[in-house]
């Protein structure tokens, strides 16, 4: 029997967090925040920003204030277009907006842009701190609420992200980033259900399409919105191949806006995988990595595809980089283990599987791969019985995990095969001892 594909290699990573645009830049229960503290609930939104602005006295912004702010925005925009963000430029941008905020405390937009500057380089602790300062002053500041939602999403707090995005939309229904964020969460729920005929799946799709249409109604050039829209239509393609045609049209619309958008290239890769065009998929995944070397999902996908091509050295490098960027990525440890196994580094492979097991003992992939490692690769004439017994133990542990029934049936067959092989080995007669070598015949004496 062959090893089930879900355990022989990690799953394709369908880009999520990297799709979400920052709201402050034109659209984009308690858990642990980016700083390790509990996440407080978002403030209650009683009035939208627009309604509050109508009810409050008109804010007068001086010419000097506007000039200082516009100058900082121009620098930010120039860096954005040049893809020039690094720790230094992010901090410089934050300092410029902070100087404007200090000089003009009433200009809350300047303080919010301090957070956006930090967020451009993934300085999430600093960005979160700034956004929280903003909503203390203005609880219905939609852009800051939206960006806090993104931070919590990126740090694995989907429920908190949804709360903040919902609040952001209540504060400002035209926030493209919050709309895309909510649609992304709905897309993830669709994937978990995996049944287009399910009523909940249909409702999630309807809501996701509404949010994405709303986002595009505000910003018709949003490559992020078109990309997520395309991913939504990729779901359910197994029962309706026409959905792939619609998905491709939406991805092409995103490409017209920004073909160098890394999540778009990753989405193209997923599309080509569904079309069984593996070489084109790999090309798209590689393009995504080139555009954004820190793009974890794209690196995972390159690693997954190259495992299939048995390019184990490339897969090893990709999964190693993912672990560097995301040390708690379970699938990356599994992928690295498979790559090292292909490179004949069995000790290294076992170490990676065990790291995955320690990371999440409830998942079964590590146990299954350890079983395969001992059964197919570590067994030899010298330690045959011990290796098979160890493999059987891992298969039995796998059977206690949550997994598809088909994979559990495969594990049961492997256990039965091990038992039969060991039993036959034990019944076999011991090998006949080799006969002692006969003495060489005497040689006649040499003639003088």
State each model region's role:
Residues 103, 137, 171, 218, ...:
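Structural marker of alpha-solenoid helical repeat scaffolds
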Residues 25-66, 166, 177-188, 194, ...:
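Long, contiguous interaction/recruitment modules in multidomain scaffold/adaptor proteins
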């Amino acid at each position: 029997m062959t090893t089930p594909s879900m355990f022989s290699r990690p799953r394709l990573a369908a880009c999520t967090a990297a799709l979400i645009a920052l709201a402050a830049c034109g659209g984009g229960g308690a858990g642990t925040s980016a700083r390790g503290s509990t996440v407080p609930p978002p403030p209650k939104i009683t009035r939208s920003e627009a309604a509050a602005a109508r009810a409050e006295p008109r804010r007068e912004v001086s010419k000097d204030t506007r000039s200082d702010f516009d100058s900082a925005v121009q620098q930010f925009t120039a860096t954005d277009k040049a893809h020039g963000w690094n720790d230094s430029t992010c901090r410089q941008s934050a300092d410029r907006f902070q100087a404007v905020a200090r000089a003009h405390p009433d200009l809350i937009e300047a303080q919010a842009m301090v957070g956006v500057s930090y967020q451009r380089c993934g300085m999430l602790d600093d960005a979160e701190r700034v956004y929280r300062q903003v909503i203390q002053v203005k609880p219905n500041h939609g852009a800051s609420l939206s960006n806090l939602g993104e931070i919590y999403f990126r740090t694995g707090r989907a429920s908190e992200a949804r709360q903040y995005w919902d609040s952001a939309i209540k504060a400002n229904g035209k926030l493209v980033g919050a709309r895309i964020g909510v649609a992304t969460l709905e897309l993830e729920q669709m994937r978990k259900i995996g049944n287009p005929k399910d009523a909940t799946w249909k409702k999630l799709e309807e809501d996701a399409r509404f949010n994405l249409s709303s986002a595009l109604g505000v910003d018709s050039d949003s490559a992020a919105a078109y990309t997520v829209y395309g991913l939504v239509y990729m779901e359910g393609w197994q029962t309706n191949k026409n959905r792939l045609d619609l998905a491709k049209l939406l991805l092409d619309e995103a490409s017209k806006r920004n073909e160098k958008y890394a999540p778009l290239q990753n989405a193209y890769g997923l599309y080509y995988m569904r079309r069984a065009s593996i070489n084109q998929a790999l090309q798209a995944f590689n393009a995504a990595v080139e555009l954004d070397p820190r793009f974890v999902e794209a690196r995972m996908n390159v690693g997954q595809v190259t495992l299939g091509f048995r390019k184990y050295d490339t897969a090893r490098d990709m999964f190693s980089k993912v672990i560097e960027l995301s040390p708690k990525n379970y699938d990356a440890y599994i992928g690295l283990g498979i790559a090292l196994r292909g490179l004949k580094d069995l000790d290294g492979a076992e170490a990676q599987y065990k790291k995955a097991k320690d990371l999440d003992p409830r998942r079964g992939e590590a146990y299954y791969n350890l079983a395969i490692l001992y059964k197919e690769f570590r067994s030899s004439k010298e330690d045959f019985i011990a290796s098979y017994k160890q493999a059987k133990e891992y298969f039995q542990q796998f059977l206690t995990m949550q997994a598809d029934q088909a994979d559990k049936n495969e594990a049961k067959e492997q256990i039965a095969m091990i038992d039969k092989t060991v039993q036959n080995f034990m019944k076999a007669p011991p090998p006949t001892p080799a006969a002692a070598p006969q003495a060489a015949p005497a040689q006649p004496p040499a003639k003088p």
